[in-house]
Amino acid sequence: MKKALVSLAALSMVHDAYAADTLPPAGKTWCDPYKNYSCLDSYLGDDFFTRLVNYYRLEWGRDGSPVDPKAPPSRRDYWPATPQTTPPMPFTEWPYGGTTSFGVTRPNSTDSPLMAALGNTTLGQALNENHIQIYGWINAGGNLSNNTVRGGNAPAADLYNPNTVQLDQAVIYFERLPDTVQKDHIDWGFRIAPIYGENYRYTTAYGLWSYQFLNHNSNYGYDLPMAYGEVFIPQIMEGLLVRVGRFITIPDIEAQLAVNNYMYTRSMTYSLDNYSTTGVQTSLAVTKNWILQLGATFGTEAMPWHWNAQIANPFPNPLYPNNTMPKDPGAVPSVTVGVRWTSDSDNDSIYVVADVINQGNWGYNNLQWLGLVYYHKFNDQWHISFETYDVHQNNVLNILNSAALNALNRGGTPFSPQYMPFNGPFGAQCANALVFSCTAESRAALWYLNYRPNPLNNISWRFEWFDDVEGQRTGTKTNYIETGIGWQHWFSPQIEIRPEVSFYRSLNAPAFNGNFNLGIPRDKNIALIGSADIIIHF
């Protein structure tokens, strides 16, 4: 691991020397598509593998792809300025969810070596003509940790097993983007995005291949965190977009897809809140500065077919007093409301959300999320991202109550070990041991400070506080603080490395180096984790 990090660092220091001019592929005459876009196809070559290799070669050391001078404008001319660039950031617009970005999205706009390689084939031409793209990435990494128990890095995110190398995620998108720049016709889009790797642990929805996580605790698994269609109606104000299917929940700085994050690891703030939901999400651009959102879905990490589904209850109790009980009490109709404002300069953006709100009963991950995200750009080098929220669930079983714990162990809850032998939701450690259940709450605040020295590098400092008030989110009733620093270096728009080091401290009780699935208690208050990953886009 150490040798790998040294090698990556050395490679990053020398690679720019090869990017001054684009050299022609073997057997080709001089051609630089960055200066003469019309020669791009000639530069790439004829067969698939030659074109694929040459496209990676073309972009090496660059911070973007060649620009077609005949392409239509990539944004509405009166729209707020684009605050960032990719690379080195994981986004160009300040992130907001549940919709394709308004005013700045054109079809076929993703820079993809695979699509370039397919460009002169019958399949590639058909895909391009229908504005469909196929692309993705492979993300692998490893960590060095003071923890030693399998699963002992948790609740730190993404590095479940300490001192290991892993395939984090292999992802492929099948996608059509609606054209949100134009205002003269209704357009449509879709995305189907299967994922495979260790990170399936963080996207699993109960009822969709969840046996891998809940019944087998598989180290690697597959999921489909995004499968949706959408319609864009530009004639309504500045545009109305309706999305239907399964999609990532709308708030948060981060996302579970590797390419959407500054650092390799995600914050505890993100990893312990909502991930995905299924249903309908509407987003209305009222003006160029204001976006309103309203969604109707079926809970968080829940499937619609679990709504009203019942299972036998072998041990009726005060929480579930009948002979049957809900399979997932969180799989119920839910409402999401969001408001986003951005300044004309796009130096400031604030996003306030009530996410997937329902009765709030203890579910697989039925979090009632209330919070906001704020971004501020100081200049082209510096910006901050800030997020804070409060989440809660009601009627969470109290594991400090002996009668409640007996009901849990004897199959009297939907999340008893008879139904979920691994990774079921935690109960609460209520303030009063005499109550059978209580409301479990958690609060968080997250800060990223980012410095961009040049177009291929970004340095991120992360600081966060997480208060697991009843211990329902992490299994330990404690406050956490975490701070980490990471470097994102891009060799090209297609290849990125992200070394980092993070320090975690549990202030009130040991919270690391244990494994509830294996019956190993946590015995450390501190986790120090160094890690690095690589993302290769295709």
Where are each of the predicted segments found?
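Flexible, surface-exposed loop regions and adjacent strand-edge segments
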Residues: 151-155, 206-211, 258-265, 309-318, ...
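Outer membrane beta-barrel
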Residues: 33, 125-146, 150-302, 340-349, ...
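Transmembrane beta-strands of outer-membrane beta-barrel proteins
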Residues: 135-143, 191-195, 243-247, 295-297, ...
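N-terminal periplasmic/intermembrane-space "pro-region" immediately following the signal or transit peptide
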Residues: 2-150, 430
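Signature for the C-terminal beta-barrel architecture of outer-membrane proteins
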Residues: 103, 181-187, 231-242, 267-445, ...
